[in-house]
Amino acid sequence: MYRLHANDPLADDAMKLLEDSGIFEISKGHYDKDELKKNLGGIEFLVVRSATKVTADVLSAGKDLKVIGRAGVGLDNVDVDAAKKLGIQVYNTPGANAISVAELTMGLLISLVRHIPRGTSGLKDSLWEKKKLKGNEIFGKTLGLIGFGAIGKEVAKRALAFGMRVLAYDPYVKNTKMDVELYSDLESMLPEVDGVSLHVPLNNETKHIISKKEFDLVKDGALIINAARGGVLDEQALYDAIISEKVKAAALDVFEVEPPNDELRRKLLGLDNVIATPHIGASTVEGQVRVGIEMAKKLIEVGKKL
C-alpha cells in the first residue's frame, strides 16, 4: 500500500473512493509549510488544493514522494519544474470545476451590468435608487475570452445563449465547432469587444497578460471580468484604467494578493464600479464533488500502474 496524505479536504465521496481502492493508507489534515516538511517522511502521494503551497523545499523534504495530486485547475501553487527534476509526477483536474467557474463568470457579468450588488446594499440601507441604477443588456454585445480551454468553452456556451457575440484568444486552440470567432493575437481581438473575461492559468506566459498596453487597445467603457488567477491581470493598470474611465467597470473573483488587504487592492475594491467575490469560482457543492472524484480516480489509476 502507498501512504497518501490529503493536506487539504476532499469531498467525502472522493475520500471513500480512495479508501475503498485498497491501495492507499490514508491520513488527512492540514499542515502549514514547516509542519508539512517535517511530516512528509514516508508519504508517497500528497493531495492538495489551493491552500497548500508545494514549493521546491517542500518537495525536497518529501524523500518518498512519488505523486502530487492538485485537486483543481491551477498549478501555480505547485513548483512543477522542481517536481519534474525530482521525478515526482504532478496531476490536476482541469475540467472538473469548469461549470462552476463559468456560472460564476456569467453571474458576475450580469451583476455588473445590472448593478445588482449596489441595488442590494442600497435597499439594506433604506435607499430606493431605481432611477440611478439604469443598466445595460448583454444581448448583442461582444465578449472577448482570453483562454478557450474547458472553462472558456463553458462561458462561451452561456454567453451565446444570452445572444452575445463571442470572440476568443488562445494560442493553443486552432479551431472550434462552436459559434465562436478565434483570434491568433490579442491585439486584433481587444478593439472588437465590449467586455473581456480571463480564463487562463497563471504561468510565465500569462503573468499580467492584461496590462496597460492591452487596456489601451480595448473600447472605451469596456468591462473586465477575472475569475482565473489574480496574477494574470495587472491590477495597478486596471485601477488606472478605471480611474481614467477607459474601463467602465470590473468584476473580480481573484486577486494577485489574497486576501486583498494591501493598499492597492483596498483602493481597487473601494471603487463603486468594482464588484468582487472572495475566490469562490470553484466553490459549489457539485464542483467540489466533481473535482474530488476526478482526482481520486486519477490517483487510483496512477497507483495501480506504479
Identify the meaning behind each predicted range.
Residues 44-45, 67, 195, 223, ...:
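Short, Asp-centered acidic motifs that coordinate Mg2+ and/or phosphate
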